[in-house]
Amino acid sequence: MAFRLPVVAAPEMPVGTQTSGSGRLPKWLKRPIPQKNSNHLTAELMEELRLETVCENAKCPNRMECYSQQTATFMILGNVCTRPCGFCAVHRGRPPQLPEADEPDRVAEAAARLGLKHVVITSVTRDDLPDGGAEHFYQCVVAVRERTGATTEVLTPDFVHCKPALGRVIEAAPDVFNHNMETVPRLYRRVRGPKSDYRWTLEMMRQVKRYNPDVKTKSGLMLGLGEQRGELLDALADLREYDVDFLTLGQYLQPGEKYLPVVRYVAPEEFDELAVLAKDMGFKKVASGPFVRSSYHARDMAETST
């Protein structure tokens, strides 16, 4: 049975004290206009090695900060996703090609040239592949470790059509396994699409620990999609019941008109409060703030784990 914290605010109210997400951004979500990506070594290297980053494809608000620090989250298996998630800016459709056999070597080359100490590897969802791309994840993790000695983190799709594929990813022994819950059960299929499964998301975390107890597990949620406070705390309790180690909480930002609207903007102080509650639940490390994303400062989270 999941551990439940007492709800400290009226559960009928969504998380956040601000007005609805329509209209102008609150001041804490405003940032200076970034310079062109071509001025940054990381972006140039990605182009040279024909690599995709989730930073660009998902329009991450932190990408210029990460590029300036010569860090990036590699996105393997192409840039076309087979899932119609309502929040994600990655192009959706039928992927035009099979995985590129030399991509693991190119990822390792980029990691080596950037001098990365912690490498995050994610992907689009590939329901068109028999193993969902698990073998490609395995090859990328092994290539990075052999070439650089860096710690590795995978941020995977759910492999819902090939659940045994999860074991192949864990055979590569990444230091951190990340799969994002994204939202609360009531909103799950609206946000993540009709093929998503909240319970399987949790079960993945349990399976990872069964395959390799030394692998740290991590998950994250976006706030501002209409979740209620009690629902959010229950979802966090579910993650802890399934022994998830690390947690990220960030503000959902609508990437374009055709995507799910922002219901509310959550104030920074509330993110701080939620971080305290999550740590009290037993998460070993929590990153909580308006601009937090699943791989934001991932190295810091991995290195400070015990």
Question: Whereabouts are the PLM-identified features?
Answer:
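Short pre-active-site segment immediately N-terminal to redox-active cysteine/selenocysteine motifs
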Residues: 77-84
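Auxiliary Fe-S-binding modules of radical SAM enzymes
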Residues: 1-73, 89, 105, 109, ...
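Nucleotide phosphate-binding site architecture
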Residues: 61, 82, 185
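Short, surface-exposed acidic/glycine-rich loop or hinge patches that mediate macromolecular interfaces
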Residues: 79, 157-160, 226, 291
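Core AdoMet radical
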Residues: 89-106, 111-205, 218, 246-248
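A secondary-structure boundary/capping signal
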Residues: 56, 76-77, 122, 155, ...
